[in-house]
Amino acid sequence: MIKITFPDGSVREYNEGVNGLQIAESISSRLAQDVLACGVNGETYDLGRPINEDADFVLYKWDDEEGKHAFWHTSAHLLAEALQELYPGIQFGIGPAIENGFYYDVDPGEAVIKESDLPAIEAKMLELSAKKDAVVRESISKTDALKMFGDRGETYKCELISELEDGHITTYTQGAFTDLCRGPHLMTTAPIKAIKLTTVAGAYWRGHEDRKMLTRIYGITFPKKKMLDEYLVLLEEAKKRDHRKIGKEMQLFMFSETVGKGLPMWLPKGTALRLRLQEFLRRIQTRYDYQEVITPPIGNKLLYVTSGHYAKYGKDAFQPIHTPEEGEEYFLKPMNCPHHCEIYKNFPRSYKDLPLRIAEFGTVCRYEQSGELHGLTRVRSFTQDDAHIFCRPDQVKDEFLRVMDIISIVFRSMNFQNFEAQISLRDKVNREKYIGSDDNWEKAEQAIIEACEEKGLPAKIEYGEAAFYGPKLDFMVKDAIGRRWQLGTIQVDYNLPERFELEYMGSDNQKHRPVMIHRAPFGSMERFVAVLIEHTAGKFPLWLTPDQVAILPISEKFNEYAEQVKMYLKMHEIRAIVDDRNEKIGRKIRDNEMKRIPYMLIVGEKEAENGEVSVRRQGEGDKGTMKYEEFAKILNEEVQNMINKW
């Protein structure tokens, strides 16, 4: 018998070889109908996969990320099965589940798959799913795998198999389709009831631009048609909120092919927005005792060899810069942490000096393939709101609590009211790959869990997801239309202090290694602004928005009065512009609403005579007429009330 421990701490005994579905059925037949996959000691299993040892166990349904992952992974195989029937001779690359759906990279040979072909492929997928074929997992030797896929002419699969270790190869079969795959999957194709293939794109095999361009087909599936219909409505709303579209309308940022792909340029209004975000975080960091530094935009190759980043990320770096005299190699800075380690080393440190908190808005450069670039969310140059905390092991929990306070202030100030966290810990079994002592790891992991509990932060624990150098805490926010975005990270690091031989003198007069904590509440300025645009649809909080007020004279003879009002507002630290175009007032109102300017002040003869303005609020319409001095007071009070909440 084996012991199965459930999330509530209860324990049941089952026969060795029991599977997830049988465990679900032993609890409730209704539950067994709803489950899609299960977790066994932190690893996601198919429901039919045997469990042969004592295990921590959890069942996953549609509402769980792991449940959706298994559902969409099987959907990718269903897509491949449909393509195999419709396009004889097609070859398959990879077909993973992704955050919202799945894709499959295929080589259709002479055929060309276009977006107009997608409805026919969807119909074939629905036909196949209706057969309710079982999805069967099988372990296979490397020799047999190479023969099976080689006989089918699957060169891409054979390439993948050649790199795998014998004894760790599995296939999944449904109907007439067999794929090389680790899983997990559904037990049958029956739950896949609603299908939408969304896009056809090109993708280089294995992401290398010197390899063949394959056809990538994206899709999403659901267990009910109603869910798909709701998703399609959400998709339309997401298009309206696309930060690339709104950023252009609001004149926040731009890209230029001449400057280079993936290199955003901030226009005056976007720069004003970004600088206010930075100043906002600076004020908070000052309160929490951070010291700001500035480091160079490049670094010697030796710096990144020491840090280990050269070996791990060298292929993602831009080509080195060679100095003509010394013949040294320099790289555009891909991250800020090695520079901050050197700052730490600049002075002898005592246990009394810790924690030391170093912050920087540091611009970094990383090479991303052209096909991966996307607006501000995936770029080749971006600015991180980076900070590194050097502390003693016994200070880790307190530092996590402080950083969590900062992140909470940031999110709530931007009206992200719904957020949760993921705690990434070591693998429960395989611990050889992690650097640092077991004692330090256990203390850090427990500190993170306790910090989340103390703050009442909903947190999901993922075993085996920690980096080799330390556990971490990732924050996920939910935007106005329900999408989840990863923003903000706190990461413990035992690796860099070791590599840079960082030390402090302890109270015992012995030298000790500090613990390093990486943190970035925004993540990067570019990504955060993109998410904020899509969350607010460009209607930023009043204190943050680039232009708070647009003054609209009804004709050119009131332009002078409009300028007078503008100057008064600016003297009272209100960001105002005058729209003095020779356009009808209705057109001016519509255009400035399109620019998401919160307040519009309409001025004509009556207003000019009485020193007044007619006030309109974005989304609320007419707010009446008042003296412009009174309006300035009301607006500043509104802004101050927002700021006081920080």
Swiss-Prot record:
Coiled coil: none annotated. Residues 1-61 form the TGS domain. It comes from the Bacteria. Its main location: cytoplasm. Gene3D superfamilies: 3.10.20.30, 3.30.54.20, Anticodon-binding domain, Bira Bifunctional Protein, Domain 2, Threonyl-trna Synthetase, Chain A, domain 2. Residues 242-541 are annotated as: Catalytic. Binds 1 zinc ion per subunit. Catalyzes the attachment of threonine to tRNA(Thr) in a two-step reaction: L-threonine is first activated by ATP to form Thr-AMP and then transferred to the acceptor end of tRNA(Thr). Also edits incorrectly charged L-seryl-tRNA(Thr). Homodimer. This is Threonine--tRNA ligase. The gene is thrS.
